[in-house]
Amino acid sequence: MNLSYLVACGLLVTFLSDKMDAQPLTPAQQKSLRSLLGEELAEFLESGENENRLDDVRSRMRLLRDLRVDTRARGMWARLLNDQPASRRHKSGSKKGGSTSRSGCFGHKMDRIGTISGMGC
């Protein structure tokens, strides 16, 4: 039973791949295309310039994608190595009472809560 499905799928793929070939437009098809889409759009679609433009756009998109990936990778390595400039403000001082002084608890400058006393503020 599985063999019959395999043969059927193989035949289906063969028939579909045969029908999917690109073929140039015949003069009758070109005429109907012009009548449906208009003269300007039909000429644009038929011309080879759109292939050059498409290649140009693809190359620009590829360059932008590579640049974006490159900057992401640099940012990741900078975070890992901690080389990026410190854009955050230092979080020091007491947050209680709105004090703006840089001294920590009890007049001592502390990096973390409880580094001196072991209990915090």
From Swiss-Prot:
Q: What is its subcellular localisation?
A: Secreted
**What InterPro entries is this protein classified in?**
Natr_peptide, Natr_peptide_CS, Natriuretic_peptide_brain
- PROSITE patterns noted in UniProt: NATRIURETIC_PEPTIDE (PS00263)
Q: Which UniProt keywords apply?
A: Cleavage on pair of basic residues, Disulfide bond, Hormone, Secreted, Signal, Vasoactive
Q: Where is the signal peptide?
A: 1-22
Name one matching Pfam family: ANP
Name the chain's protein: C-type natriuretic peptide 4
Q: Which organism is it from?
A: Oryzias latipes
User: What's the encoding gene here?
Assistant: cnp-4
